[in-house]
Amino acid sequence: ISRCLGDVVRVMGDPEKMITRVGMCSGSGSDEWPAAAALGAEAFLTGEAKHHHALEASAAGVVLMEAGHHATEAPGIFALADALQNWQDIVQCNVRVTKSVVRAYGISVR
């Protein structure tokens, strides 16, 4: 996941657990982990996780992964930009798409 999204992934819960189904909510979506677990997800990927959500998920046996707000939203935004550009030819309207990357936090300090 880290290689695909280009960001560090923090894992809360059992890092050795065998995972067959993952739920996901981009951005700050850690409050959605119970809905994913109810659908059979053994792990949940989000951009930002609240501390108590991580504790609750871990206690329920769900591995919670935090991969960065921007990193989890960018793939969807870029796909939407491409789709809008393609729809321009079908709908006959003027669509201008601008792709940019702005990160709220530039560096991590230890």
Name each region found by the language model.
Residues 1-110:
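Hydrophobic structural segments
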